[in-house]
Amino acid sequence: GMTKDELEKNLGTIARSGSLDFKTENQSDNIDIIGQFGVGFYSAFMVAKKVTVISRAQGADTAWKWESTGVEGYTLTEADKEDVGTEIILVLKDDTDTDKYSEYLEDYELANLVKKYSDYIRFPITMYREKSRQKPKPEDAGDDYKPEYETYTELETLNSMVPIWKRPKNEVKDEDYNEFYKNKFMDYTDPLRVITSRTEGTATYTALLFIPGSTPYDYYTKEYEKGLALYASGVMIMEKCADLLPDYFSFVKGVVDSEDLSLNISRETLQKDNQLKLMRNSLEKKIKNELHAMLNNDRAKYEEFWKEFGRQIKFGAYSDYGMHAELLRDLLLFWSAKEQKMVTLQEYIDKMPAEQKYIYFAAGDSTDRLAKLPSAELVLDKGFDVLLLTEDVDEFCLQILHSYPRKDAEGKDGTVEFKNVNSGDLGLESEEEKKAAEDATAENKALFDAMKDALNGKVKEVKVSTRLKDHPVCLSADGPLSIEMEKVLSKQPGSEGVKSDKVLELNVNHPVFAALKAAQEAGDTEKLNKYSTLLYAQAQLIEGLPVDDPAAYAEAVCSLMK
């Protein structure tokens, strides 16, 4: 209970100045106002047109009544109350077309509110609830007796009081965590991993986190809301606190409970709280360490996780200009053409031959097609592995990483760069082989210029290839924008004009090249143009690109078959 002075102090002061002023005026006391009677009390006026508080303190001779309509001050008068304690009486506002205040008179609505916001208050919150039960069957009831029911009231404790995250770990079974997760976060599947954390020191908190077993239906949409449920001493103050999680770990669900949040009245002040920032940094490290542990100790489960949320990790590495790339790079998985399984970048590095200069990759829409690319086959024939990237974000992720740590032959720290098998020099040829290709390109300059003119600006250059073995032709990209990146960017609004600088590469040892030379030497410009169109279209198809002009391509094929 409260005395007259305590009613005046706890309710009157806040009524005059507001909770933030109350905090400011009492900042020297270093008080925590969550749970203080009065703070949040005035939210009652959101639903009530009058609030009455009747209280009698322990050992006091008189009870006092505080009353206010929330408009102009309050009254404080003596009251009749024999027992010690406090009663709060709300006179609800009248219902309107938009607000139904009378719903707060329904016991299930009140019970739901308590369950949602105050389920873990340390003290029991009880309420008399009306229930129904079947009456005992009379002894003389006949065969046609129909069961009768009666209503009764029962005092029910609405809150759990001791949250699962504060119970000793040896008292909580996996099934308990799974049930809590499914009930709390409305998921029908068990979580993939449960993370518990208790941190004391600069930031003191208890956390119970879950990595879901499946991707939420709206996860990769703008409608998805990230965040952890934030509690202060068992009172939920925010259902989804987004500031506790970085975007790349936005799939994590759970609760965080802290007893020493420094300022926790509103979202605005909470978001600026240093304790919250410390908790976020600590949680981020904890989640990353748990993912590493899963990767190293339970690979099958990690690959399940990667299938569901790997894309988000890659987006995290790429976003913000690669600010978090180094933090996340060891969590990345890609398909290995040589190993025929998912591998980490470190696992790729560990199996690289000493003479290998790059981490090779190919990007496209399927691993089967990528493994058959002429340039990928060339790298694989050399005994080097190729990472096969099949998601839009993959190549952007590796581009932002640029390189990965690798010790040289002397054990000194160094790095090795990523290399698209369809871009630039692959570092596979000797200087003599490069010189021979350059000489062959110069020797056939007239032919290549005629082919470039026939393709009317579709390629930057036509040249002799050093990356073709059995295939007659391929496309490569000159510059930072690869052909696959062009495909991805072309899907974005306003990016229709983004083009990579394509190079048409020819195999001078293939019979098709002899046919090209013959058409040029015979002065058959029409045939040379058709050959050029066919070869460019063939190179497009190999790269998974749509043919620019399918009708012209079909006509060229048919005319050459006559």
Which residue stretches match the model-derived regions?
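GHKL (Bergerat-fold) ATPase N-terminal catalytic module, capturing the glycine-rich phosphate-binding loop
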Residues: 1-107, 112, 119, 135
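Extended active-site and interfacial segments that coordinate phosphate-rich ligands
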Residues: 7-25, 40, 64-72, 79-80, ...
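Conserved, well-folded catalytic cores of nucleic-acid-processing
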Residues: 10-21, 25, 47-57, 91, ...
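ATP-binding catalytic core of ATPases
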Residues: 75-136, 147, 154-185
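GHKL/Bergerat-fold ATPase module
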Residues: 81, 99-101, 122, 138-168, ...
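Amphipathic alpha-helical
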Residues: 307-340
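C-terminal interaction appendages of subunits in large macromolecular complexes
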Residues: 319, 323, 327-331, 346-562
